[in-house]
Amino acid sequence: MLERFHVPEDVAVRVKQQNVRSTIEGIFTKMGMSDSDAVQATDVLIWADLRGIESHGISNMMRRYVEWFQNGEINPNPKWEIIREAAAVCTIDSDKGHGLVVGPEAMNVAIERAEKYGIGSVSVTNGSHFGAAGYHAALALEHNMIGLAMTTGGVTVAPTHGSEKLVGLNPLAIAVPTMNEPPFIFDASMSSVAGNKIALAKRLGVDALPGWVADSDGTPIMEEKPVPDDYIILPLGGTREVGSHKGYSLAVMIEILSSVLSAGGAGANRRGGLASHHFLAYKIDAFTDVDQFKKDMDEYM
């Protein structure tokens, strides 16, 4: 996490993990979730906070989750189901279930199918925000698998050279096991800056860096200044000169795999739920020797 996003020490309040855990679990159950689902949802938020991903942690997300519960955009007791499948792949209708709960469930389905077929691929439609993508991808590590997780973020990004919000933030994560080194985990949105970091910047009163956002007509803001109210987030890369077409195209790729593939539409024409997701699990020993793979990863790291 960049230093500008840290809460100033003079106003920071530190609490024991167990204390905050019980509080957040209590909020989730108050919203109607089962005890077990509340525990799972809290796990994802604490995982993010402990790794410095404050944009997807408790303080930045809980207010929004409560709002989404209250306005019906998150169903506290979903009856998610597999609506289409073929061997190693399937599509799940999340029934607007909380992504912090249905996300791990879907990733585990991908892992189960990878155990049987060598690879597992699961699309989720009619879903909601699933927190830090890295949490879901990392579930594959203990199974000697490579995990990928991606999701459709808010449609707040302009295409390269564009002046309208037509593209999702669309984060992607990959988790790769190693032998002795820490696992390789990459987790990032395909925008110049995560949307939740913009919300965090506005909450903390800190400036946006050059190339993060554009003004209302799509002109990139190339000086450090406060985030304007009518901002548009730029694709990863910021401007065409430094590669924003790559970030834009990666965001489109994730939109296709997560939303279009699960019959959820795309961009401003999405339908059903707050988000769609896609999860992949690769069983390493279906491709190569696991120990050799991990040794090679150690050397690479």
Name these PLM-found stretches.
Residues 56-111:
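Active-site cofactor/substrate anionic-group-binding motifs, chiefly glycine-
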Residues 206-266:
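Secondary-shell segments that build the walls of catalytic and ion/ligand-binding clefts
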Residues 1-17, 21-41, 58-73, 207-209, ...:
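Acidic, glycine/proline-rich low-complexity segments that act as flexible tails and inter-domain linkers
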Residues 33-40, 55-58, 263-275:
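Flexible, glycine/charged-enriched surface loops at secondary-structure junctions
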Residues 89-179:
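A generic, well-ordered mixed alpha/beta core segment in the N-terminal half of proteins
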Residues 2-23, 256, 267-301:
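Catalytic-core signal marking the mid-to-C-terminal active-site face
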Residues 157-228:
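Phosphate/diphosphate-binding glycine-rich loops and adjacent basic-rich segments that engage nucleotide
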